[in-house]
Amino acid sequence: MNIWIRGGTSDANNISKEIKRNFKDSFLILTTTTDFGGKIAENFADLVISEKMTYDNLKKTLLDKKIDVFIDATHPFATHASETGIKISKELNIPYIRYERPSEKFKNAFYVENYEEAAKLALKISKKNIFYMSGIKNLKNVSEIIPIEKLIVRILPTSVPEALKILPSKNIVAMQGVFSENLNKELIIDYNCDVIITKDSGKSGGLYEKVSGATLAGAKPIIIKRPEINYPLKFEKIVEIVNYLKNV
């Protein structure tokens, strides 16, 4: 069985590990969008492709590799990747499986639909600084709403050059996560923040530690909801994927 796993997440690596354990003769191709993710993925797959693939390139590769099953284990907010995977799988008549990391609701958090709404709400309820913990991608948009002097951001070290175009270095925390509850708490306190902005990235994205750390620091968590996508087939447990593959 030739299996394509679209990843770049720890979820994808864990899925690959379990598939190889249960299906010794399977051929696993795991994709990531960065070389860093690719190096990690090499431990779990037969072939790793570390590049952003165009629609046509992805379609051709799926055909060339004679893929039997397409597993989407991308980040919950990687909507374009998921929608592309669904469309191509349908065109090629390849079974599509979505692994969706479980979501958890927090009673003390504010939930919003998008980054603009999050930034506006944060500005409204904050009397101190605002800690943005949702990556580099939407930082520019958020910085156009929240005054730069109030905005603290935590990003990957590789994103620092881009962040410096938006914020001064004293407002940038460059670290590779996932982070503990205590570290989150201490950072929020040290940077004098009373609100955090994050997204519903689930347990493997460190959401619980962010929210609990914020609560201990006396800060209000604002969580951006996951986008809604109509997946053809979705599982929240890796064992469910393994069981499905046994019947393919």
Curated annotation (Swiss-Prot):
EC number: 1.3.1.106
Keywords: Cobalamin biosynthesis, NAD, Oxidoreductase
Database matches in Pfam families: CbiJ
Reaction(s) the record says it catalyses: Co-precorrin-6B + NAD(+) = Co-precorrin-6A + NADH + H(+)
UniProt KW Mitochondrion keyword: no
Enzyme kind, highest EC tier: oxidoreductase
GO function terms (MF aspect): precorrin-6A reductase activity
Gene Ontology terms: biological process: cobalamin biosynthetic process
Pathway assigned to this chain's UniProt record: Cofactor biosynthesis; adenosylcobalamin biosynthesis; cob(II)yrinate a,c-diamide from sirohydrochlorin (anaerobic route): step 7/10
Function: Catalyzes the reduction of the macrocycle of cobalt-precorrin-6A to cobalt-precorrin-6B.
Family: Belongs to the precorrin-6x reductase family.
Record protein name field: Cobalt-precorrin-6A reductase
Organism: Methanococcus maripaludis
Gene that specifies this protein: cbiJ
